[in-house]
Each structure stands twice: as structure tokens, then as C-alpha cells.
Amino acid sequence: MTKEKPAVFYNRIIDKGRLKKLMSWAYTSFGSAHCATMADELKTLGFRYATQAGVSISVDDLQVPPIKRQMLDSAEQEIKTTEARYSRGEITEVERFQKVIDTWNSTSESLKDEVVKNFRETNPLNSVYMMAFSGARGNLSQVRQLVGMRGLMADPQGEIIDLPIKTNFREGLTVTEYIISSYGARKGLVDTALRTADSGYLTRRLVDVSQDVIVREEDCGTARGLKLRAMTDGEREQISLEDRLFGRVLNADVVDPKTGEVIAQRNQDIDADLAKKIATTVAEVEVRSPLTCEAARSVCRKCYGWSLAHGHMVDMGEAVGIIAAQSIGEPGTQLTMRTFHTGGVFTKEAARTIKASKAGTIQFKDGLSTRRMRTPHGDEVEQVEVAGTLVLKPSDNGKMVSHALSPGSFVLVAEGASVKKGDLLVEVGAGQKTQKSTERATKDVSSDLAGEVLFDNLIAEEKTDRQGNTTRSAQRSGLMWVLAGDVYNLPAGAEPVVENGTHVNVGDILAETKLVSLSGGVVRLIPNSREIEIVTASVLLDEAKVLHETGGGSEQYIIETSKGDQFLLKTAPGTKVQNNANIAELIDDRYRTTTGGIIKYSGVEVAKGTKKQGYEVLKGGTLLWIPEETHEVNKDSSLRIVEDGQYVEAGTEVVKDIFSQSAGVAEVIEKNDILREVIIKPGELHLTEEAIADKYHEQLIQPGEEVIPGVTIDKLSYGEKVISTEGVALLVRPVEEFQVEDTPVEPSQGSINEQGAGRNIELHAVQRLFFKDGERVKSVDGVSLLSTQLIIEIGAIEGEDEDVLANLYADIELQDDPTDDEVKRLQLVILESLILRRDSDSDPFGGQVQTRLMVEDGQEIVPGAVVARTEIQCKEPGEVRGIRSGQEAIRRLLIVRDSDRQTLAIDGKAKVKENTLVVAGTEIAEGVVIEDSAQVLKVSDKEIVLRHARPYRVSGGAVLHIDEGDLVQRGDNLVLLVFERAKTGDIIQGLPRIEELLEARKPKEAAVLARRPGTCQVEYLDDETVDVKVIEDDGVISEYPVSLNQSVMVVDGQRVGPAEPLTDGLNNPHEILEIFFDYYAESKGIYEAALIGLRESQRFLVEEVQRVYQSQGIDISDKHIEVIVRQMTAKVRIDDGGDTTMLPGELIELRQVEQVNEAMSITGGAPARYTPVLLGITKASLNTDSFISAASFQETTRVLTEAAIEGKSDWLRGLKENVIIGRLIPAGTGFASQNDFVDEGTSRSPNGYSNVVTNDNGAGLSSRTYDDLDGSEILDDQTARAFTEGKSNRKDIISGDELISDDTPIPSDVQGKAPVIDDDAMIDDNWMKDQ
């Protein structure tokens, strides 16, 4: 078989990338069969040579570049310099941190380059180098960690740790480095696990939204197209125009702007060579795209372009939607949530720099203007404000070199300066175009030494917020000095006893605290304790003994008086009780009843009180008690056994399982068929007339009275009329009497009352009744009617507050009797307890503390006497400073020690004045340079006295925690620096960002977009806010509110178009759509406006999705994203149906609405008005025409219910609906076209293939000629088929489309030969038998 193509000879190293290109070239040029064979042969070749070379990998192959040590040293040197600048107060803590991080970052980067250079120059056959750079395994970042340095890591909060990992895995990590490493590594693992699930769900949603997109038409005939240009990020090209054009179809002729020659025509598809040619001549090309395709419910072949699977025009019936969904979903697992395959190593793009190519002088041209600016490293540089050109005029009068600079770049040289070759001229900023999104962050700065604070050129301003909190912040940048000294924290209540300027020695008292007794009394010192008790008043029960009884797991104390009365102690010894507390109760059974009953007072008077505490008896008398037993039942009435009014004997069962304890008349109380209570009333029952019963009802009957003839009462009784089972009767109930004395039993007590205190304390017995007069007591077992309690009474002193009494407590104590060891006595004491400070105080800044006791045990003291003094003593000699009096008094005191000063001898004249602050490195006299910053205390001819100090640079806007003159300890916070930092890329990137875009979510911090074109006015106001106005073309001024944490991206006078961002942040695609629609609706009509709006938001979405994938180095063809975005932007929301049948709020395809509106314009009806909407993929899936597909996706019940209510039909157009109900799917490239077969029956290919065979580019099969086949030829299906069709007179090849039936005559020249059969051929069995 002869080939017309020239032989190709490759002579170069083939790595992974080139191998990809080779395979793709083989595939597009020779088809799948040849490509597969070649791949096989390459594999064999590879194994063969790998075996011969014996490539292996060992630890020795990991060669660390020898220059590494030197690079680390220079980085450390640079950091030392930065630290020195920091200690001189030239840069802030934030700038220092930033500089350290950038230094290590660039060191790590340049070390990486060295690693590569080292391998390349010393041993290009090193197995690690070959492996990584051929693309077999591993990447540069991993090689860097093996033989370079691991670099900076982030901690779990995502903050960068400024201690880099200087070692690599070959050298081994230190313990610290290992721990720091494990943060990021763990994060990577967790991330992978979470990612898999997320990515799978994303793919499912994508498939669902696009499963019904199938190529159903040849050409939709649209004139619309999409303008393509290279996708850039700032200056950097992300996807070249060449790559974006490949496999597209042109929508307009491409004309060479120089020669006017037509390079390519409309509707021509673009292969790789043509793409390259077009990209080199023009910057923007209009192509056809699925986004602009007008085919109904599908995409046409021309708009889709090549099928990237085989590099030819897409076949009819190809399910391009599903391919698109898989192409976007599959790389999802490679996208990150946070870190990317580097085990948490921090990576950041280094700024691009421009260096002088030769020596010369610098000129600014084209209106280049700059302003002074402080870089993040604290260097003062010029930043480009208005773009222009920087020109280097060589000193050898050669050709001038010019560099165009965009705003934001840093110019490191002055105009007119002369530079040497290799000098750094410019750090190129990323430019205004990129989203330099920043966030406000804060950092605390704490003091490195103790001392007093001095402000140098630092002005504090106070702001009060709405809540009334006052914050003090620095108006502009300045220095805060801490002058060294020993700061003593004074304990609460300590008063200084020295004055400012006094000189003190070790052991001198600086301040003291007095411990004062308020009430006075007798001192009690407790051994081994820091507590001093002062007894103010006490009472001792001198004749009563205290008995201690234990039993049954509980213990109790009983007080026995000399008369034999016993009181039970209610509160345990050692507890503190308040005034009027009940501490003991008389053990006494005289008032105990056996059952419940009714209580009546006879002569007894009680005070008002509460049921809980009881009613205090004021005057004695008799208590009358009429017993009865009450059973509270609360059960169903059917369980009752006795009747109301029935007389029962003791022991009778009255209700199931309840027995009466005494004989008497039963009273039954029922409510709603529930038996509440059964009351048994003991007594004698006499049947009598009603009049008599009424007379004695609820009356006391005196002894000797005859109630009924023949019945005389012999003791005090109580009458009650009852209706018994036998009729009216009088129940005579017994009455018990209890005598109550006027005064209760009281134990004898001797009390001491300390002089000066004048406070009294005594125990006082009280009788308390627990029931009111006439109260019915419900009980079966009996109750105690009266109890005698011992109450503690603390006497008040004249003229004292009630609060004092309420706060006094008495202590219950048991005292040993001096005469009898067995006996304990009860004592009640009122104490004041004072706690001494610990001498070994935990505060290391407190100085030597010594506490002296001023009283002895048993000593009587007057109120206000000093019990102890705590003295704070000086630790090192020095001069006292920093004491303030009055309102400003602070609990600290400063001593300037001799070690805080330094005296330097000088020869010549001093160059500094007294009281000035000088930073390290300053020359203070001829030849005398100080090493540390200091304050000049004294200048004389011979010497200069300095006081050590430390400056801290404070940036403008920082929050000040302290004031001038304050004393600070080491480690105290001085200021909170507020600074802007670039948002770390992982805020949202990777999968979450893709999801946010495809679900069309509104971003959290959206950018403010201009609504109409115009010119910006940017005004920076005093209170740090920025005022942005746009003067629109018709003169209208619109204001745009900017929130505090957004930075403005436009400059004054800049021209902006519609939907251009004014601030940083992510654009909201809904807003882009709305702005363009509103802007063009009036001038172009709503259909065109809707198309423009949708086109802009489509472009935004496609580019943003591409950006995310590109940032991870994943290439996806635009057309896949376009297919998905097309599905998201197909619908509009009806605002007003006009004369159509559409309802407001309905979501309908734009195409459909426009068809209806066109019909309306012909009939003269009012058209429907609508707004274009952007649906997220989930929403779009739920709003498809097919309810079966939507229901199988999410919210099944809702979707099906709505479809049923609306009476929807499903036309089964997509793949999913057909699969669900078990039909064949309406897709696939082999489906027969409706067109008749062409060319008088010679070519029988369905139109899907006729195009492949006659592909214009010769990339297809038409460029081959076939001679006779020999047995070694490799054929794939298409080749075989095309071959048959090309030579339809040959009978020895049977293609798959020829169906041979039983009666087909077999050509004579075929008989006996084995035919070449492709795998689609359907061959009749009989024919095979005959062979």
C-alpha cells in the first residue's frame, strides 16, 4: 500500500508531553488501528531499553546541590538585616514577617532552579532527574522537597509559619520540622477524602443538566458567533488563541490585516496548522459556538465543531452533553479544596522583575508618573500611578531599551539615575486587571522588655463606635518606644511609700498593704493557715451537753439540757448560719397525733407566718384535735368497696388494697367517676331526727350533756350530722386536747460580749404550730402539731445598716469542756475572717513580698486596728519612676536599675542632646557607634549616659492598647497592627469555586459593578472610606457604596463600561446579566438585550471555570463548558404574558418565547415581556422539559406532583428519560439518517461518515489511495468501510453495511477465499457453512 504522505523522521528526546503529541498525530493521521499498534511497539521498545539501561533509583541518586549551604547562609544574612531594621524601628512587625516569608520563598525557588541546573550539568542521566522531567512520575515540587528544601509551611489555621523547613528529605528533618510538616500532610489526606465525594456529586449534576444535548442537525444556519481571543490573567497568558481555536468552525472569514489575503473561510473547521497560522496573524477571531447555536433542543454539527475524540467533525447523534459533563466532572478529583500535591508546602507566585540589560541612565516617558509608596517589606519606593514607559538609555549610545509599565508596578530607580548591568529596575505588579483581592488582617505586637512607654512622632486619635466603646488608634505612622526598667506590679490595695526620683537599695520597702479589722474583737490564730479570725461576739450553752449519735449511716448531734430536755441539732457543726436560722428542735412526742384530723385553737394565739416555717405561738392555750383518717386514692370508682355514710369496723377493706385503721363512718369523695378520697370518721353513730342532728352539727358537745334521750356524753366531743345507709344520724366524734405552754423550754446559756463590738448574740426558743385554726389535716399515720425550735438571734448595733446584719454569719462550733473530756459544749461565734497574702506570690513581677503579723493570739483589738502589713521590697538598686497620683494612679511602679543604663566614654564632642532617642547604629560622638537603641540621659565632655530602649514602628490606623507614660511588663501587648494582605488563594478555589460558578451562586463578597458606562470619580475620605461615583454618558451621576473591607480597583478619571468591576471581589454573574439587559433593553429591544446579557454572563462563566482548571494545570476544551453554560442560560422568566398563553413567573426557553412573540407581532397581539435568568445546574436540571428526568434527579415527589397537576407530557427527548422507562436511547452515531442514500447507490454510508471520508483537510481518509491489500495491512472499521465504498466493484471485501441474505448469489471469484470481514458485518450462517 503506497502512502502519499512523506516519511517523518523524529530525532529528539521524547518525554511525556511529546509522547502525547506523537500519539495524537498518529491517531489523527492514520486512525485508531495504526495508533494502537504504534503504542504497542513503543511500549516494547521502552521496556527493552529500560532493561538494558538497568535504570534504578537509590538514595545516592538524590544529589543535593552543593550551593545550597551558601544560599541558606545568604538568606539568613538577609533575614538578620531585616531583624536589625526591625529592632531599629524602621519596619513594623508585619513588614518584618512579610519580608522573612518572601526571602525564604525566593530562596526556595532559586534553590529549585539550582537543583535542576545541578542535575542537568553534572548528571543528566540521574534517575531522579530522568523520572521527574520525562513526566514518568513525580513533579518538580516533589523533587525540590527531596533534594532542595521543603520551604515554608502553613499551620492549621492557614497562617504561614515564619520558620521554614530548611532541610529536605534526603538530609532528614529535625523534630520541629517534622511536626510542622505533619500539619499540611494531614490536611492533604483529609482533603482528598472529602474531594472524591464532592467531585462525584458535581459530575452527577452536570450529567443531569446536559444529558439531552445531542447533535441532531447539520447546520442551524445562525449568523451569530463568539469572538475568541487568548485568555489572560493580567500579563500572563493562560490559554493561547491557538489552543482555543483548535477544532472550532469559523463564523467569519479570517483576513490577514497586512496583506488582505483570506486565510480561512466561514464554516471552515480549524485544524492545528490553521489554528497556528490564524493565531499568528490576528488577535481576535469570530467562531461558531454551542452558546450561539440556534438548533432547537440540541446543538448542530457546525456550531459544535470537531469531536475531540477522533479529531474530525462531530458525528450526527453524538451525545455531546454527556461528554461535556464528564470532561468537566472527571478532573474534579484533581482539583483541590486547599493544598495541591505538595504536602502543604506554601507556594506563591513571585513578582516579575525587570533588570537592566546594560549600563545606562533611566528616563520616564509617555506620562509615566509615580508616587511614594511603602512596600509590604517596609521599603520606600515609587509606585506607578499613571502608565507610561521606562526608557534605559545605554551609556555606550546603543539602541534604547524601553519597558511599558502598568499602574501598580514598583519602580526601584529614580528618574535620571544611572544603573549598572543587572541592576533591578522594576517589580512588575500584576496590573489592575487581575483581581488583587485583599483583606484586612491584624497582628498583635508585644513588648520584648519591661519599662515605660514613650511616643515618638505618634499621634493617637480616639473613635467611639455606636456601642460607646472607645478605641484609640494611630493617626499616622510613628514610633513607640519602651524605655527599659524594672516594673513592679503592686497588689490590690498597696500604696507606694517612696516618691519619684528616690534612690532605693535592695530590701528597701517600695509599697505596703495593710490588713485591717473592721469590727474588732478577740484574735484567734489558726496554726498552719493563712487565716486570722477575729471573734466579735459568742454564746456558749454552758450547762447543756452535746451527744454525738451515729446509726443507720447518718450521724446526729443531740443537745441535752440540765433539765433533761433533748434538742436535735439541725445544722452540722462547722457550718455558718444567718440571723434567725433554726438550729435545733426539741425532741418531744407530746404533740404527735396518730391519724389526721381537724385542728381547733382554744385560747392559743399565733403570729402571722408562712406554712413552710410554721406559725409562732405568742400565747399558750389548748389545741383541740378531732381525729379522722384520710385515704387519698385517685383511682377508678369501680374499685370502691364501701358506700358513703356506711359504718365500718377497724381493718375493713374500704377500697381495693386499702384498709381502715379505726372504726367509724366512711365519707366517699368522687369526681368525674374517679374516686378521690375516702375519709373514716371515728365515733358513735346514733340514728335520730333531722332537727337534733342539725342542732349539734359541727358543734362541740360538753361532757354530761344528753344529746338524744338515753345518750349522755361523758367527755368532750364533736357532733356531726351524717346521712348513713340507714337514714339521718348524729355522729359523736371524740376530741383530744393538747396543752400549749406560754413559754417554751430554753437551755441555759452564758454569752461573752466583747467590748467595743457591742453586738449581742443569743439562742432563743420558739414554739411553732404547723396548721391554722380549723384546718383539716389529711393523713393516715399522724402528724406533729407543734415543735419547739432554737433560733439564733444576732443583735444589731445602733445606727448600723440593715445590710451589715444580713451579711453577718454565726459559726456553730463544738467546744471541749475543760472539766470533762467526754463532754462537748455548743458555742455560737460571730467572726470576722481575714486572709493573709502568700509571701511566695506567684507574680514574678511583684518584687520581694514580706508579710508581718501585728497581733497575737487571744489579743483584743479595736475596730480599725491593723492586723498585718505586707511589704513589697526592692530587688535591685535604682531610681524610682512612674508613680502617678490622683485619677491616673496605676498599680505599677518602675525602677530604673543600674543595669538599664550604660555609660560610654567619649573623646570629642557629643553629637546628641540630652533626652533624645537614638536607634542602634547611630554615631553619638566621634568614632562611637551604639549597638542598641537607647535614650540619652546625660551628656558631658567625657561621657554619655544612655538608658536602654526599644523602638517599635507603628503603622497608621493601628489600634493602641496603651498610652504614653504607661508601664509595661515584658510580653504585654502594645499595639494591634492593622494591615491589608492578599487573600490567600484558598479562600475559594478548586472545586468549591467551580461549584459556586456552575450553581450560579452569588459570591459572598461580590465586587461592585458599574451599571452604565461613564467616567469614575474616586474620592478618599478622612474616615478611611472611599466614595466612588460614575458620571454616566448622559450626565447622570450614580453613587456606588463601597464597604470597608473592599478595595477600589479604579482610579479617578478612569473610563468604565457596563458591568466593569469598581472594587475587588468576585463578580456576580446574575448581576452581569441584569446590567447588560437593563442597559440594552431600551435601545435594542428585549430580545437582543437578553441575548447580549446572556452572552456576557456566558462568557464570564466559561472564562472563570477555565481559570480554575488552568490554575491547577488541567486543560479542558471550551466547548464542553459552553455546552453546560448553554443549558444554564436557555431560559427567561415571564414578567407579563401579554396576549400569549404564558403566565408571569413561568420559566420558558428564550427561543420558544421569541417564536410566540413573532407570531403575536403578525397577528397584532401584545407580546410577552420577560427577563433573562441564569439558573444553576441543579435548578436547570429541575426545570427541564422532561419531568421524568427531573424527578429522577431530586425532589421526586414535588416534581411528579406538579407534573401531574399541570398535566404535563414527557416527549422522551433525552437519554435519561428513555433509560428510565427502558427504551433505546435516541443517540448514537450509527443511527440511519432520513436522507435517501446518495450517488446512485454506490456510496451506502450514512451521512455520518460521508463527511469523514471526504474531509477537506486531508486529515481524514480521502487522501489515501489503496492498492491491493496484502495480509500485513492494519485496518480499523472506518478504513475497511471506506475502502469498500471507494472500490465498490471489488467483491472480496464485505463491509458491515452489506447484509447478505440466504438467496444472495456468491460471486465466483470469492468462492473458496476467506473474505476480509470487519466486525460489524452481519453474515448469514448458511453462507459461512458453505465456506
Curated annotation (Swiss-Prot):
It is an enzyme of class 2 (transferase). Zn(2+) binds at residues 220, 293, 300, 303. Residues 1236-1257, 1294-1331 are annotated as: Disordered. Binds 1 Zn(2+) ion per subunit. It comes from the Bacteria. It catalyses: RNA(n) + a ribonucleoside 5'-triphosphate = RNA(n+1) + diphosphate. One of its GO terms (cellular component) is DNA-directed RNA polymerase complex. Its EC number is 2.7.7.6. Residues 1243-1257 have a biased composition (Polar residues). Its cofactor is Zn(2+). Keywords: DNA-directed RNA polymerase, Metal-binding, Nucleotidyltransferase, Transcription, Transferase, Zinc. One of its GO terms (biological process) is DNA-templated transcription. GO terms for molecular function: DNA binding; DNA-directed RNA polymerase activity; zinc ion binding. InterPro entries: DNA-dir_RpoC2_beta_pp (IPR012756), DNA-dir_RpoC_beta_prime (IPR045867), RNA_pol_Rpb1_3_sf (IPR042102), RNA_pol_Rpb1_4 (IPR007083), RNA_pol_Rpb1_5 (IPR007081), Rpb1_funnel_sf (IPR038120). Belongs to the RNA polymerase beta' chain family. RpoC2 subfamily. DNA-dependent RNA polymerase catalyzes the transcription of DNA into RNA using the four ribonucleoside triphosphates as substrates. In cyanobacteria the RNAP catalytic core is composed of 2 alpha, 1 beta, 1 beta', 1 gamma and 1 omega subunit. When a sigma factor is associated with the core the holoenzyme is formed, which can initiate transcription. This is DNA-directed RNA polymerase subunit beta'. It comes from Picosynechococcus sp. (strain ATCC 27264 / PCC 7002 / PR-6).
